[in-house]
Amino acid sequence: MKVIFLADVKGKGKRGEVKEVSTGYAQNFLIKKNLAKEATKQAINELKGKQKSEEKAQAELLAEAKAVKVKLEQESTLVQFSEKVGPDGRTFGSITSKKISEELNKQFGIKLDKRYIKLDHPIRTIGLIEIPVKLHKDIDGIIKLQIKEA
């Protein structure tokens, strides 16, 4: 019996795959536990439609990520911060990925989730700093920060 897997089943198939399995296994286990459904023509066409829409959504995300990367690479895109600095040259407050994301949105209108900003630890120094950003699984960018003494 041909089935369409609705979830990953170890040793049998991954979500979205169409495979042949024994009738008893399909009816008594996979279909009962909603791990798969029977592969009728209608169900297969439905699956193809879903896959096309997912591909289209991925392409849109990729295009959006490329556009953000182009904006970030412009020389005018320099995120400005002014922080109070102690006698040792370190800032009193630290600059986190959340702060960077908010300033990027406020100064340039670029909306970027703080989870995309790859910051090992909060920044506590002044000067010009470049921070890597993971915009998409295939696209990386760099945010340039200018931290000045207030």
Swiss-Prot record:
SUPFAM superfamilies: L9 N-domain-like, Ribosomal protein L9 C-domain. InterPro entries: Ribosomal_bL9, Ribosomal_bL9/RNase_H1_N, Ribosomal_bL9_bac/chp, Ribosomal_bL9_C, Ribosomal_bL9_C_sf, Ribosomal_bL9_N, Ribosomal_bL9_N_sf. One of its GO terms (molecular function) is structural constituent of ribosome. PROSITE patterns: RIBOSOMAL_L9. GO terms for cellular component: ribonucleoprotein complex; ribosome. It comes from the Bacteria. GO terms for biological process: translation. Keywords: Ribonucleoprotein, Ribosomal protein, RNA-binding, rRNA-binding. Binds to the 23S rRNA. NCBIfam families: L9. HAMAP family: Ribosomal_bL9. Belongs to the bacterial ribosomal protein bL9 family. This is Large ribosomal subunit protein bL9. The gene is rplI.
